[in-house]
C-alpha cells in the first residue's frame, strides 16, 4: 500500500532538509500549503524554524489551523519537528498566540545555567522515557542535534517519550500520544540516529500506524 506523506509549508520550515531525508529513505512528500492539499495525504510532518507567534500567524494565513486541530483530534498521524513540536502545545512563553493545543501544557524558556548556553545548540544524548514509533528503550543511546531556546512542559508527563539533559535538568526532547508525536531536535540533521528514527516512523506508518497509548 502506498503512503502519501505531506510536509506543511507555511514559510518557516526547513523543507529542503526534511525532503532530502525522506528521499534517502525512498519516500516522497507533497507540500501542504492549504486545506485542499490535506485531502491527498495520509500522514503529516510539521517542521519549524523560528519564533512561535510568527509561525502561528503564518499557519493562520494558510487556513490550516482548524484543519490541523481536526487532524489531531481525529488522531491521524502527525510528526512535529523542532518549532513544530512547540506549536502542538497550548501556548508559549515566547509569544502571546494560542498554539494548536494537540498536547496539553506550555512551552517555557530554558533556564540559564552556568555551564550551558542559550540557545541550546549541538549534539546531545537522549534518555528514553517510553517506547514510541521513533525510539525504543532497547536502542543504543542516540545522539541528536538540537537548536532551541524553549522547551515544552507537558501537563501530563505520560506523553514524554524522551528527554535530554540541559544543565541540571531534563528537558523535553520528544512527545508522543496516539498517532501524534514530535521531536524538539532535528532528526533530519541527526545523522544515522535521526535517519534510523525516521525510517522506523515510516515503517510504523506502512504497517498501519498502531496508536501508542
UniProtKB/Swiss-Prot annotation:
InterPro entries: Class_I_gatase-like (IPR029062), GATASE (IPR017926), Imidazole-glycPsynth_HisH (IPR010139). The active site is at 82 (nucleophile), 186, 188. GO terms for molecular function: glutaminase activity; imidazoleglycerol-phosphate synthase activity; lyase activity. GO terms for biological process: L-histidine biosynthetic process. CDD domains: GATase1_IGP_Synthase. Its EC number is 4.3.2.10, 3.5.1.2. Pfam families: GATase (PF00117). It is found in: Cytoplasm. Its main location: cytoplasm. IGPS catalyzes the conversion of PRFAR and glutamine to IGP, AICAR and glutamate. The HisH subunit catalyzes the hydrolysis of glutamine to glutamate and ammonia as part of the synthesis of IGP and AICAR. The resulting ammonia molecule is channeled to the active site of HisF. HAMAP family: HisH. Heterodimer of HisH and HisF. This is Imidazole glycerol phosphate synthase subunit HisH. It comes from Synechococcus sp. (strain CC9902). The gene is hisH.
Amino acid at each position: 500500500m502506498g503512503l502519501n506523506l505531506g510536509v506543511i509549508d507555511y514559510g518557516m520550515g526547513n523543507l529542503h532538509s526534511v525532503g532530502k531525508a525522506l528521499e534517502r529513505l525512498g519516500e516522497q512528500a507533497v507540500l501542504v500549503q492549504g486545506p485542499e492539499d490535506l485531502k491527498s495525504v495520509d500522514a503529516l510532518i510539521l517542521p519549524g524554524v523560528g519564533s512561535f507567534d510568527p509561525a502561528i500567524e503564518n499557519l493562520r494565513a494558510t487556513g490550516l489551523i482548524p484543519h490541523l486541530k481536526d487532524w489531531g483530534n481525529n488522531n491521524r498521524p502527525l510528526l512535529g519537528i523542532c518549532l513544530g513540536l512547540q506549536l502542538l502545545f497550548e501556548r508559549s512563553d515566547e509569544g502571546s498566540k494560542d498554539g494548536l493545543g494537540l498536547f496539553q501544557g506550555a512551552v517555557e524558556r530554558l533556564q540559564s545555567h552556568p555551564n550551558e548556553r542559550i540557545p541550546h545548540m549541538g549534539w546531545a544524548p537522549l534518555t528514553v522515557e517510553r517506547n514510541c514509533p521513533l525510539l525504543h528503550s532497547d536502542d543504543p543511546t542516540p545522539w541528536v542535534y538540537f537548536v532551541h531556546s524553549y522547551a515544552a512542559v507537558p501537563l501530563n508527563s505520560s506523553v514524554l517519550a524522551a528527554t535530554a539533559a540541559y544543565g541540571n535538568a531534563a528537558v523535553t526532547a520528544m512527545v508522543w500520544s496516539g498517532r501524534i508525536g514530535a521531536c524538539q531536535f532535528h532528526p533530519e540533521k541527526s545523522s544515522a540516529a535521526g535517519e534510523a528514527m525516521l525510517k522506523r516512523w515510516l515503517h510504523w506508518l506502512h504497517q498501519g500506524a498502531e496508536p501508542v497509548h
